[in-house]
Swiss-Prot record:
The gene is murB. This is UDP-N-acetylenolpyruvoylglucosamine reductase. GO terms for molecular function: FAD binding; UDP-N-acetylmuramate dehydrogenase activity. It catalyses: UDP-N-acetyl-alpha-D-muramate + NADP(+) = UDP-N-acetyl-3-O-(1-carboxyvinyl)-alpha-D-glucosamine + NADPH + H(+). It is an enzyme of class 1 (oxidoreductase). Belongs to the MurB family.
Amino acid sequence: MYKKKKSYQSLKNLNTFSINVTAKKIIFVKTIQSLMKIWKTCNLSNIPYIILGEGSNVLFLENYAGVVIINRIKGIRIEEKKKNWLLHVFSGEKWHDLVKYTLRMGFFGLENLALIPGSVGSAAIQNIGAYGLELKNICQYVDVISLENGKTIRLKKKTCNFSYRSSIFKYKYNNGYAVIAVGIKIKKNWKPVIFSSLLKSKKILEINAYKIFNIVCQIRKKKLPNLKKLGNAGSFFKNPIITSKKTKKILSSYMKMPYYIQKNGFIKIPAAWLIEKYNFKNIQIGDAAIYKKQKLILINLKKANSKDILKLAQIIQKCILKKFGIYLEPEVDFINSLGKVKLL
């Protein structure tokens, strides 16, 4: 039925923020059948439940009153087409492990997304992205299962409503559904996705997928905190997307502000730049702080609780709103005793 079942166990090692909260039960599942059986038990008994992968994009606000289901449904199926490789990847696979696997197999195209924490399922839900590439660029379909009747629904890329760090799986296919697999299309005719840090590399003229993978890993290791030492959920805030009018207003005071024009005409501003320009110095709430090497990341120095992190996040939001007129939207999901909630 499931690999492990724990009662009133700490979730500290199951969320990358390392928040020391508990759940009524923690259950690791390895099959779809196990997942459905547990869901039915929770549903019949009116017990709250939540499905997690690697716990890399969540902040637990308090002890969870229900069952935390840890998705360990794994497996990769490969289908060869004339021009592409099609990978059917189950949602419990670790994303970075998938990237390494494709490189070993000689399938190139995922290397820009190396070292992103989390599972394949959460990659689709979140539409992960980095260094010029997003999940939506390589996704063929996403399979979700109705936990009520066991029917699998395949959503092709166009119907997934992928957008900046979001998808249809964050709202419509949320309660009563679970992402079980992601279809990924990798072109045989590989072309590198070039990004600014890559252009600065001396090896740009002899670039290949393996070198891009190594460069991305080096960059991320250099600027991102070690999860084993400093709890965090990666980028705490989304990069704000604002109007050209507001962008021009800010540029009149900050001529060197970086910005990126979107296809719809709106402008994306790096949230890390906004936070850095405010100059919060060494602000710290309890054991919650801003990571010095990447201002977009809030860290748990040792024993921070959710209140510390939330208070720090609120201070940042208020200050950035006052100085730039920009609201920083959280990227992490907040979970209270009954499930996901909207905060900040």
